């Protein structure tokens, strides 16, 4: 719909701004051609880590070691180490950049080298498996179907992927595009996020545009429109 509007003359704004999502399933197997999006809610309880040493990471990538073989002191919970105030809930761009950095250092754990662990072991010990299952069972099932690993028993592997473009149809403060009378709200417009969108903003944008802004602005626009003449000739 946005592209159709663009073809009719509507302006596009900020097409270069792209959001990266840090919690995706890395490419694996013969049929998964791209990373698969997971929910950011997983980072509420999962702890993100990679091995401290490149040698341990290489052993995991080649199948000579498993994550359970890495002792606690040989694990780098890098978000907790670098950002103690946020820990594993650091903003998306920071978490994504940090994951790429440790993988670029040679400490990635996926077969491709592009993956880090999201580990629920401590949360399961603290809260119990039933609580974790009640929160994430659908996500865990999806992960297991794709990867073949049981995340209740072994850490998930995750890696950042392109998620969202902040760009969209240009709108003014009344949410009207450059085509008079064509209004655009929610994720289809460009207006709210700048160069980076914070997590959990999609619902907020839809509510703000659709509930608070558009009912007033579109009513004002329609109130200013004068009806044209009506042809009453039925012949």
Can you name each region flagged by the protein language model?
Residues 12-17, 154, 171, 184-185:
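General beta-strand structural signal in soluble alpha/beta enzymes
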Residues 220-235:
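Long, amphipathic alpha-helical stalk/connector segments used for oligomerization, subunit docking
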Residues 10-145, 216-219:
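An anion/pyrophosphate-binding glycine-rich loop and adjacent beta-alpha core
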Residues 127-176:
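Accessory "access/gating" subregions that flank catalytic or transport cores
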Residues 42, 163-165, 199:
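Short, small/polar residue-rich loop motifs at catalytic or cofactor-binding pockets
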Residues 1-8, 131, 191-217:
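A conserved FAD-binding loop/helix module that cradles the flavin
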Residues 174-198:
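Short FAD-binding loop at a beta-strand-to-alpha-helix junction that anchors the flavin cofactor
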Residues 17-26, 188-190, 231-234:
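Acidic, glycine-rich active-site loops and adjacent beta-strand->loop/helix elements
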């Amino acid at each position: 719909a946005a592209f159709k509007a663009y073809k009719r003359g509507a302006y596009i704004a900020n097409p270069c701004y792209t959001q990266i999502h840090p919690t995706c399933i890395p490419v694996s197997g013969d049929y998964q051609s791209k990373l698969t999006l997971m929910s950011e809610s997983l980072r509420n309880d999962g702890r993100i880590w990679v091995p401290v040493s490149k040698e341990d990471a290489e052993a995991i990538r080649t199948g000579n070691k498993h994550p359970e073989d890495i002792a606690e002191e040989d694990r780098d919970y890098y978000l907790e180490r670098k950002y103690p105030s946020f820990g594993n809930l650091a903003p998306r761009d920071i978490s994504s950049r940090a994951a790429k950095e440790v993988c670029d250092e040679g400490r990635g754990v996926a077969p491709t080298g592009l993956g880090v662990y999201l580990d629920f072991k401590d949360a399961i010990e603290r809260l119990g498996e039933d609580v974790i299952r009640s929160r994430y069972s659908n996500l865990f099932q999806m992960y297991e179907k794709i990867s073949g690993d049981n995340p209740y028993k072994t850490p998930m592997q995750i890696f950042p992927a392109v998620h969202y473009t902040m760009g969209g149809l240009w709108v003014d403060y009344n949410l009207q595009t450059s085509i008079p009378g064509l209004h655009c709200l929610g994720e289809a417009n460009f207006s709210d996020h700048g160069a980076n969108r914070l997590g959990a903003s999609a619902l907020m944008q839809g509510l703000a545009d659709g509930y608070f802004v558009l009912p007033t602005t579109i009513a004002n626009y329609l109130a200013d429109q004068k009806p044209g003449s009506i042809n009453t000739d039925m012949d």
